[in-house]
């Protein structure tokens, strides 16, 4: 019988299950017979038998090098099965076999292809994670140190706080009102001076230089043992903003309003950015928000009211005045009856009950049955900016009576019933719930026609109107009549949010009321003066 020459590569077959091998025993036996008939196989078997009799360990060359008697290209096994084709064949497990001999002599003589590959890959892939930040390249490091040298030149004892501001803006490139925070991070001994060497240790050797600005801001603000920001971490930068910003200079004579302004800014930051609601603002949340951009805008813009995100004084003024109007006894707390008067009794009792049940958010107020100023800030932002995701989440929790994550027909009807009753009492044309239900589903277009989930609301531009229909009568009627004033305002400032437009309207109203009050007080004083009889 003429021998058949086989391509060795054909022996490198995919792993086959035992069941399939049993069903093709004739083919396997034929293949094995053909392999045994090869001249190379005859030499291999003879060599292995002789080595086994002599007690010589089997050494196979695997992709690198191996040591031993039969290693190298002259080995019959290596010539038939080159290392590049895969791992060596495993010999039969029998007494005196090469496998037993290898166990006796140790594993050091057999190279591992996996180890070779791992070492090679380790050499090719550079380190990409640095726990304390990526070290700066030498050229960047040298450029930064040269700038530092120029700013510290002639100040052997170091820079004082006022002199350090230039370092904050030109070296650190963060907003100028971060100067005090950075200064205290470097001046750990409270000497009142920052030395050149100490600043290099903090900024360059501490790898702050290579961090992007959001990570820099996060690191500057947070406490050393924290990996998150708490509200108090923002107070130093806001105090410096109040002390240095030209648009807030007029508040320097009223420290109590400076404190209220700073608190309001912090509450607004946490409302929009701290989506977990746990009071711990993470780096990931900070990166997803727009706070750093707003900080840079506030640093560059002299008119603080143009910084609509977080820092506008006019926005603070509106929030504080709305709270003060409701807080009739001025104990800085609001109860349920106070809140029901919000926006000329626009809200239903049922939705106010849900708010005071602390369903959408736990009150920070320690007085039972009353909300504090922070709680009110969250409420008014949710009420007047219903297109934002935090607002949608706030009101969704209120309407979701059984907290199962979906709004059903019964839940929607429960809240609309009070709206319907109010319309009837005011002799207005009532809209039946069946018609409202169709309108709500047309606006939201939920994936499931049987209920509305939070993602459905987040995917619709009309979601805010859904909640207005359910529990805010004033906004519901304005939506039904398509208030032309609101339409003009939207067209005039298309980039503004609902909150921006509301705050603008309210600030104008409050300013006009204050002007009228001032004029009234002035005329009364003049009238009193005219009645005085000189002596």
Curated annotation (Swiss-Prot):
State whether keyword Transport applies: no
Q: Cross-referenced CDD domains, in alphabetical order?
A: PPP2R3A_B-like (cd21504)
Query: Where do the segments described as Disordered lie?
Result: 67-104
Signal peptide (UniProt feature, chain positions): none
Fetch the InterPro entries from UniProt. EF-hand-dom_pair (IPR011992), EF-hand_13 (IPR041534), EF_Hand_1_Ca_BS (IPR018247), EF_hand_dom (IPR002048)
Keyword tags: Calcium, Metal-binding, Repeat
Q: Output the Gene Ontology terms for molecular function.
A: calcium ion binding
Ranges where the EF-hand domain occurs? 174-209, 387-422
Q: Which Pfam families match?
A: EF-hand_13, EF-hand_7
Entry binding sites for Ca(2+): 400, 402, 404, 411
Cited SUPFAM superfamilies: EF-hand
Q: What does this protein do?
A: Probable regulatory subunit of type 2A protein phosphatase.
Question: Subunit structure of this entry?
Answer: PP2A consists of a common heterodimeric core enzyme, composed of a 36 kDa catalytic subunit (subunit C) and a 65 kDa constant regulatory subunit (PR65 or subunit A), that associates with a variety of regulatory subunits. Proteins that associate with the core dimer include three families of regulatory subunits B (the R2/B/PR55/B55, R3/B''/PR72/PR130/PR59 and R5/B'/B56 families) and cell signaling molecules.
Identification of the protein by name: Probable serine/threonine protein phosphatase 2A regulatory subunit B''delta
Q: Supply the source organism for this entry.
A: Arabidopsis thaliana (Mouse-ear cress)
């Amino acid at each position: 019988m003429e021998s058949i020459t086989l391509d060795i590569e054909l022996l490198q077959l995919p792993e086959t299950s035992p069941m399939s091998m049993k069903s093709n025993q004739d083919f396997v036996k034929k293949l094995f017979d053909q392999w045994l008939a090869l001249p190379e196989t005859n030499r291999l078997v003879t060599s292995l038998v002789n080595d086994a009799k002599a007690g010589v360990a089997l050494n196979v060359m695997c992709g690198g090098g191996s040591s031993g008697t039969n290693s190298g290209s002259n080995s019959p096994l290596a010539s038939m099965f080159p290392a590049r084709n895969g791992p060596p064949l495993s010999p039969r497990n029998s007494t005196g076999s090469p496998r037993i001999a290898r166990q006796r002599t140790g594993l050091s003589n057999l190279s591992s292809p996996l180890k070779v590959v791992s070492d090679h890959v380790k050499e090719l892939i550079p380190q990409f994670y640095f726990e304390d930040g990526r070290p700066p390249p030498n050229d960047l490091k040298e450029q930064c140190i040269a700038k530092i040298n120029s700013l510290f030149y002639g100040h052997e004892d170091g820079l004082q706080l006022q002199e350090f501001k230039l370092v904050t803006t030109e070296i650190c490139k963060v907003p100028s009102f971060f100067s005090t925070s950075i200064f205290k991070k470097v001046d750990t001994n409270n000497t009142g001076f920052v030395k050149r060497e100490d600043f290099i240790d903090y900024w360059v050797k501490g790898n702050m230089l290579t961090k992007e600005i959001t990570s820099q801001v996060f690191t500057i603000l947070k406490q050393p043992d924290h990996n998150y920001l708490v509200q108090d971490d923002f107070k130093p930068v806001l105090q410096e903003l109040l002390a240095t910003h030209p648009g807030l200079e007029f508040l320097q004579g009223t420290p109590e309003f400076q404190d209220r302004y700073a608190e309001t800014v912090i509450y607004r930051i946490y409302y929009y950015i701290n989506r977990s609601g746990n009071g711990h603002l993470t780096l990931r949340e900070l990166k997803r928000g727009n706070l750093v951009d707003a900080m840079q805008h506030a640093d560059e813009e002299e008119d603080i009211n143009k910084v609509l995100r977080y820092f506008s004084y006019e926005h603070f003024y509106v929030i504080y005045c709305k709270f003060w109007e409701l807080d009739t006894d001025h104990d800085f707390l609001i109860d349920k009856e106070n809140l029901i008067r919000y926006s000329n009794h626009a809200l239903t009792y049922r939705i106010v009950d849900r708010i005071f049940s602390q369903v959408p958010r736990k009150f920070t107020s320690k007085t039972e049955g009353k909300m504090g100023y922070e709680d009110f800030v969250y409420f008014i932002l949710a009420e007047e900016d219903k297109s934002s995701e935090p607002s949608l989440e706030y009101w969704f929790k209120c309407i979701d009576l059984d907290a199962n994550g979906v709004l059903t027909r019964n839940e929607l009807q429960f809240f609309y019933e009070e709206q319907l009753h109010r319309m009837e009492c005011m002799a207005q044309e009532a809209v039946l719930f069946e018609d409202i239900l169709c309108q709500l589903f047309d606006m939201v277009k939920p994936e499931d026609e049987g209920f509305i989930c939070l993602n459905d609301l987040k995917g619709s531009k009309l979601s805010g109107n859904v909640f207005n229909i359910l529990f805010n009568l004033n906004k519901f009627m304005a939506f039904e009549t398509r208030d032309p004033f609101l339409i003009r305002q939207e067209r005039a400032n298309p980039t503004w949010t609902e909150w921006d437009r509301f705050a603008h309207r309210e600030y104008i109203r409050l300013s006009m009321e204050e002007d009228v009050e001032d004029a009234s007080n002035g005329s009364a004083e003049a009238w009193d003066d005219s009645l005085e009889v000189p002596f």
